[in-house]
Amino acid sequence: MERIDVSVLMAVYKKDNPAFLRESLESIFTQTVEAGEVILLEDGPLTEALYEVIKSYQSKYPALRVVAYPMNRGLGKTLNDGLQLCKYDIVARMDADDICKSNRFETEYNWLKAHEDYDVIGSWVDEFTKDKTQVRSIRKVPEQYEDIKKYARYRCPVNHPTVMYRKAAVQAVGGYLTEYFPEDYFLWLRMLKNGCKFHNIQQSLLWFRYSEATVAKRGGWSYACDEVRILVRMLKMGYIPFHIFCQSVVIRFTTRIMPLPIRQRLYNLIRKT
């Protein structure tokens, strides 16, 4: 099997599901190409069941490098430290509960190698609940760089767990800033502002695990305030004009503080359009 110069970067913490982690790791190690290294960051102490899954893959795959942190520090800080450990400039992100399609790494890596002036490549995702063959919706994102820049004014322009990026470009803007949430959205905004070029492949390269908790954690007063803080920074950066700032504050804040059942219906409606 061909081996590619890519570092896979993922984090796991104690509330992750061991069965889901196993599926995620299995999808990484059954790609059509082999990643040069897989860095798994243990964000604080884990459950015995999670440790068992990790040990079973360590014994089979020497490319798997496990780094344990004694305390849970959150995804952003953990990923920043993990980036420092990646030995390749091209880094593929992965979450501990999602499943890569078998051609994901090969497709993204070949695209980046053919387009040296681009820094970030992503794709669509197939959302599922229990069975990945039963896709409930597809999260589509725009393909071309100019369209991605415009889209980013209103919504996150890439699906984070599908992303493959150049480490140097991420570190040039300071990596994930943990004081702003969602950290990935704010990272993409700063990279776009810094002139980094993005592209989204117009096909699904990952199965994204969806549950009611997916929508629940993206709401509430705290999340709403975090989004407003990002919008304020976007305005100060000159990324959005004042009228879009005002419009976005009203729409996003109202949406985030809606009762969960209403927000759930709205989420389903958006995914169907």
Which stretches of residues belong to each language-model region?
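Acidic donor-binding loop at a coil-to-helix junction in glycosyltransferase catalytic cores
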Residues: 181-189
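Catalytic beta-strand/loop signature of glycosyltransferases that borders the donor
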Residues: 124, 198-205
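Conserved donor NDP-sugar-binding/catalytic core segment of glycosyltransferases
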Residues: 103-136
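Glycine-rich, basic loop-to-helix element that forms the pyrophosphate-binding segment
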Residues: 69-86, 107
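Short aromatic/hydrophobic "clamp" motif used to bind/position activated sugar donors
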Residues: 91
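Catalytic core of nucleotide-sugar-dependent glycosyltransferases
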Residues: 196, 208, 216-241
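Short, well-formed alpha-helical segments that are part of the catalytic scaffolds
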Residues: 15-30
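A conserved acidic beta->alpha catalytic loop
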Residues: 42-51, 71, 95
